[in-house]
Curated annotation (Swiss-Prot):
InterPro entries: ATPase_NBD, Carb_kinase_FGGY, Carb_kinase_FGGY_CS, FGGY_C, FGGY_N, Glycerol_kin
Keyword Calcium: no
Chain sites annotated for binding glycerol: 82-83, 132, 237-238
Coiled coil: none
Source organism phylogeny: Archaea, Methanobacteriati, Methanobacteriota, Thermococci, Thermococcales
E.C. number: 2.7.1.30
One GO cellular component term noted in the UniProt record for this chain: cytosol
GO biological process, one term: glycerol catabolic process
Gene Ontology MF term list: ATP binding; glycerol kinase activity
Entry-linked HAMAP family: Glycerol_kin (MF_00186)
Residues that hold ADP according to the record: 12, 16, 259, 301, 400, 404
Protein name in UniProt: Glycerol kinase
Amino acid sequence: MDRYILSLDEGTTSARAIIFDKNSNVLGIGQYEFPQYYPKPGWVEHNPEEIWEAQVKAIKTAIEKAKIEANQIAAIGVTNQRETTVIWKKDGKPVYNAIVWQCRRTAEMVEEIKREYSDVIKEKTGLVPDAYFSASKIAWLLDNVPGLREKAEKGEVMFGTIDTFLIYRLTGEHVTDYSNASRTMLFNINKLEWDEELLEIFKIPDGILPDVKESSEIYGYTKILGPEIPVSGDAGDQQAALFGQAAFEEGMVKATYGTGNFILANTGRMLLYSDNLLTTVAWGINGKVNYALEGSIFITGAAVQWLRDGIKIISNAAETEELATKLESNEGVYFVPAFVGLGAPYWDQFARGLIIGITRGTGREHLARATLEAIAYLTRDVIEEMEKLIQIKELRVDGGATVNNFLMQFQADILNKKVIRPVVKETTALGAAYLAGLAVDYWESMEEISQLWRAERVFEPQMDEKTREKLYRGWKEAVKRALGWAKVVS
């Protein structure tokens, strides 16, 4: 009987399930969207029950489309939007909506903590203090949901990022992996354990925290599909994508183009620190931990969604390529999509979106092009920071926006580096599948996985240096004008 791996890819706007075979081929995909809720300006929430329902439907659809039986699934891997915070009771019922990674409700709380503890947090967690991470979200829930702090002190509730919530629902086990734990701002990445001092700073009882495991091991078994199936892979979405790109060697870099852009560089066993980038755990396997440098860009693909749903100048994302190629250049129009502040390398919670360079002749093609170019500029901002510490020859790319050939070519041009798009686009889900499969000997080794990675297209830089640097200077000027804007108008 042929065996397969089921990967659960729980994103910011949809839950997906993908069936992979031993050669990394996709046999079936299920995908269901779920809503985001915005109770106040800057607040972003999900209903965890809607995530679970969407995930279960996605699993069933993927199995149907793959035309396989549940007993052919050798293992399940989980990958997830990171930092998003859920607290639930022991019966699995959430006590409040999930607070999403994009949510800014705790920005002022974090600013206060940052003044006193910024260096401590950076040294222990590798993170820049920001409302983006889980710690302040947990603190907010404990302080604002009636009776929750008391329940937490008694050990009656559990905290988890979305992976932990899904694994608990699947297996009854309260666990996470190193990569997800490293995004909470409570996990010491040197000692690989929850940190007492950080828990004290945020006033979080340790009894609500999950056990931290390797990224590839059996966490428990699920009978949700009938037969007992091991759940044996877990990694945050960006770390999973790095693994799915087979970026196993030091200095290998990938960029995922999704709701936001996330650039990770494998630094091997080395903990490298940068003032403007995050240091994070890439994965833990076979008793060894790999670290990574990360640049997190909050809004990229979401800016394209805004063109479609916000100002309604396109009907679908693919239109942006067609519109952008109608112009020879951006004609001086820049768009800084700082809808929720700016992440790496700026780390300005108070930056806001800006479109500059508009004239009477500016049309929707200019806005479409400026949006795509912004994604590439933001990515270069991060790569330049990384190159202060490591040498980067090429960029492996994945995520929805990589189908946009204009964007990929412009990315190669503005970086002056090769941009390589793989055959298998589902690298995040594939990474979780690989981690799950390794734990049950479906794949024997990381060397075997490396042999499966194949390039679909290589984009070579074609732009002359003078044009490249002129465009980038314009971008830097536009960003300056966006920084701190929320403070100016508050």
